[in-house]
Design a protein with these regions (language model features):
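Acidic/polar, glycine-rich intrinsically disordered N-terminal extensions of enzymes
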Residues: 4-97, 101, 105, 125-133
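Generic structural signal for well-ordered, non-membrane alpha-helical segments
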Residues: 36, 65-69, 105-109, 149, ...
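Flexible, glycine/charged-enriched surface loops at secondary-structure junctions
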Residues: 54, 124-130, 167-180, 227-239, ...
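A short, flexible low-complexity segment enriched in Lys/Arg and Gly/Pro that occurs
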Residues: 56-77, 173-188, 257-276
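Anaerobic metallocofactor- and corrinoid-dependent redox/one-carbon enzyme cores
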Residues: 61-78, 83-87, 109-110, 274-291, ...
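Small-residue-rich
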Residues: 69-72, 78-193, 197-201
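Glycine-rich anion/phosphate-binding loop at the beta-strand->alpha-helix junction
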Residues: 206-208, 213-304
Length: 304
């Protein structure tokens, strides 16, 4: 798996963003004109790649071997390769990042690098800390009053949280673990069956957390059944991570948008108009979001 290569930058003055000899800098002019070996060397020279990274990238042997692939998934008949590039110029919270991207479509890497350079000239991106809260769902099918079931669960929230945390004491020792519960009730559309869903809110720290959350949900299921008199069915992580949303902001001086015969104000107004259409029209929104996903998908493939 290719690393997310980064290095702290001590020079936060945007006026120096074009200096290519700065150690750790992700600003490397003419990078796209270099031969591949020279690109790898430039990243290594700046401390953005380790010696092991250089050896691996220089070997040209990047494909998973067929016998290894056959042990990873079912019905293997081959392996599939895609180009891996790096987006340059990222300055995030005053730290330089070179971002690996795996993608087959041209212009995505260049476009992302160009946008990052524009952001860099204005001071770069600012990212707020994210609380790594994941949600585990415990589905309880009931015959009784859902409000009473919910109140029963809430009355025993401390016991439920303590039981969940007893299953992962090391996570609790690292400052994470189950924090709280939430309860909701629903009625099935077809047959009117009543169900209560309990959310277990879990701070997973630096762990991805899926197995941890699943184990906690499974571990409290019997106790929840005893409390409610219902029957627990699903007990599993939710992939809607709306409690762990990363937020980034960037400020770009209007004068930096000037180019190709347009003033900075004209470019700014055009961006705002395009965004207004995406907010109002689902057909533009789909295209708008596809452009965003070009970068998200490429980064996800590169970093696993």
């Amino acid at each position: 798996r290719p690393p997310m290569v980064s290095h702290s930058s001590t020079d936060n003055d945007p006026s120096t963003a074009g200096h290519s000899n700065q150690e750790g800098s992700s600003r490397i002019p003419n990078f796209f004109r270099m031969p591949i070996a020279e690109r790898i060397g430039a990243l290594h020279q700046r401390g953005l790649l380790s010696a092991d990274d250089v050896q691996l990238l220089s070997s040209g042997n990047h494909q998973v071997q067929l016998n290894v692939a056959d042990k990873m998934i079912e019905n293997v008949v081959g392996v599939f390769g895609l180009p891996m590039g790096v987006a340059l110029n990222f300055l995030i919270n005053n730290r330089d990042y070179v971002v690996p991207l795996v993608v087959e479509e041209p212009s995505i890497v260049a476009g992302l690098s160009g946008a990052a350079r524009l952001a860099r000239l204005g001071g770069g991106f600012t990212v707020a800390p994210v609380d790594p809260i994941l949600i585990g769902q415990v589905q309880i099918v009931i015959d009784s009053d859902p409000e009473q079931v919910k109140q029963t669960l809430l009355a025993h929230r401390e016991d439920i949280v303590a039981l969940a945390n007893s299953l992962h004491p090391k996570m609790v020792a690292r400052g994470g673990g189950a924090l709280d519960i939430e309860v909701f009730d629903y009625q099935a559309e077809e047959d009117g069956r009543l169900m209560v869903v309990m959310h277990l809110l879990v701070d997973t720290r630096d762990a991805m957390g899926a197995n941890l959350v699943n184990t906690m949900c499974e571990g409290v299921a019997s106790y929840v059944e005893g409390l409610t008199g219902g029957k627990v069915f699903l007990r599993i992580l939710s992939n809607l991570t709306d409690r762990a949303i990363a937020r980034a902001t960037v400020r770009i001086p209007v004068k930096n948008l000037e180019g190709k015969g347009y003033t900075g104000e004209e470019v700014r107004n055009g961006i705002v108009l395009a965004n207004d259409l995406a907010l109002a029209d689902p057909y533009r929104a789909a295209t708008h979001n596809k452009g965003i996903m070009n970068g998200v998908d490429a980064l996800a493939l590169a970093t696993g």
